[in-house]
From Swiss-Prot:
This is Abasic site processing protein YMR114C. The N-terminal catalytic Cys-2 residue forms a thiazolidine linkage to a ring-opened DNA abasic site. Glu-132 catalyzes reversal of the thiazolidine linkage; self-reversal is favoured by duplex DNA formation. GO terms for biological process: protein-DNA covalent cross-linking repair; proteolysis. Residues 25-48, 270-368 are annotated as: Disordered. Belongs to the SOS response-associated peptidase family. It holds the Pfam family SRAP. The active site is at C2 (nucleophile), E132.
Length: 368
């Protein structure tokens, strides 16, 4: 199953990222002229190929959210709603899309829901990676799976269009997961890579007939450790209103090498704020910070406090003598006096007064 994924790029960044994969990307005008493929007789004329809405990067895309897909017929990026609604739907508001945000590979030729999209409306869903939860008893632990090289990731998808509502929707195809990921989940999205046999076949608009055996052989997921990676992330991804970049950061220290430089910069910034007197002790009550961010800031503040106390102790040892003599008291008074408040005259008076008591106190000590 794939119920959450991340797309860490704005709409303006995506065309170049596809070109980096040597994929052609048409402009809205070019795509519009090619939108009527010979096999799409039932499609509506003048279909929009690029949403008018500007897509912003989101690190927690869930069903019913909009995201980017790449259409092979128009060779354009289009933003559609996640959770496929078939073209024959009479009332979109009553259609339960939670049942259709994934399509099982082995059922594509067995279900009326999937047969037509599989024949004529195939696509690739763009993402930075997807989330999966490992369940042990009542405990669910989220993991993030992405490309090891950090490049844009593609998974096999299908789309449909409801004309009366002018609504494009898509689904993500999943299959039996590879042995290497069975411990995490039994199913996995069908990952595609441009330039491979599976990509070319799935994105071939001239191919409209499939057998289940052919589809399974073509799209069955495998886990190539040299290309894919996974690591544990914060539980905050479970809440759909959380969408920040921190959701895809490794939670465990051994997984965090790729983020170490950024973390050091963030901690240095906190230390600088601490030195300048900016009060960061309110982290605990800051509802905008959760999970790992709170932990990191608390750790930074704790370290700052310890370093500050240690520094003060060292300064005391080097600048203030041990207690006992009158001269010690003089130096302590000099160190503690504020010239702006007391004035230089009062300071000199105190120093002289304490200095005059030195001999008498010294005699008492000798007498004892």
């Amino acid at each position: 199953m794939c119920g959450r994924f991340a797309l860490a790029y704005d709409s303006g960044d995506l065309p170049q990222l596809l070109r980096d994969w040597n994929l052609p990307v048409n402009t809205p005008k070019d795509a519009s002229s090619n939108s009527q493929h010979p096999h799409d007789e039932e499609d509506t004329k003048d279909q929009p190929t690029v949403s008018k809405d500007i897509f912003k990067a989101s690190y927690n895309i869930s069903p019913t959210n909009y995201s980017a897909v790449y259409r092979p017929d128009t060779k354009a990026i289009q933003f559609m709603r996640w959770g496929l609604v078939p073209f024959w739907t009479k009332d979109v508001s009553q259609f339960k899309t939670y049942r259709t945000f994934n399509a099982r590979l082995e059922n594509l030729q067995e279900s009326k829901m999937w047969m037509r999209p599989c024949e004529k409306k195939r696509c690739a869903v763009l993402m930075s990676g997807y989330f999966e939860w490992k369940t042990v008893g009542k405990k669910k632990t989220p993991y993030f799976i992405s490309r090891r090289d950090g490049r844009l990731m593609f998974v096999a998808g299908m789309y449909d269009y409801v004309e009366k509502d002018d609504l494009y929707t898509f689904t993500i195809i999943t299959a039996q997961g590879p042995r290497e990921l069975e411990w995490l989940h039994e199913r996995m999205p069908c990952v595609l890579e441009p330039g491979t046999e599976s990509w070319d076949a799935w994105m071939d608009v001239d191919k409209t007939t499939w057998s289940t055996e052919e589809l399974v052989k073509l799209l069955k997921p495998d886990y190539d450790e040299s290309k894919l990676q996974f690591y544990q992330v914060t539980d905050d991804v479970g809440k759909t209103t959380n969408t920040g970049e921190r959701l895809i950061k490794p939670l465990l220290k051994e997984d965090s090498d790729m983020f170490s430089v950024k973390r050091e910069k963030e901690e240095a910034l906190l230390e600088n704020d601490n030195e300048q007197g900016i009060d960061n002790r309110g982290v605990k009550g800051d509802k905008s910070l959760k999970g790992e961010d709170v932990f990191n800031q608390k750790k930074s503040l704790k370290r700052n406090s310890y370093d500050g106390l240690k520094k003060n102790e060292e300064q005391e040892e080097t600048t203030l003598p041990e207690e006992g003599s009158i001269g010690d008291r003089v130096k302590r008074e000099e160190a503690n006096l504020s010239p702006k408040r007391e004035g230089n005259r009062e300071k000199r008076n105190i120093v002289n007064m304490l200095g005059n008591q030195k001999d008498s106190r010294g005699k008492k000590k000798i007498k004892k």
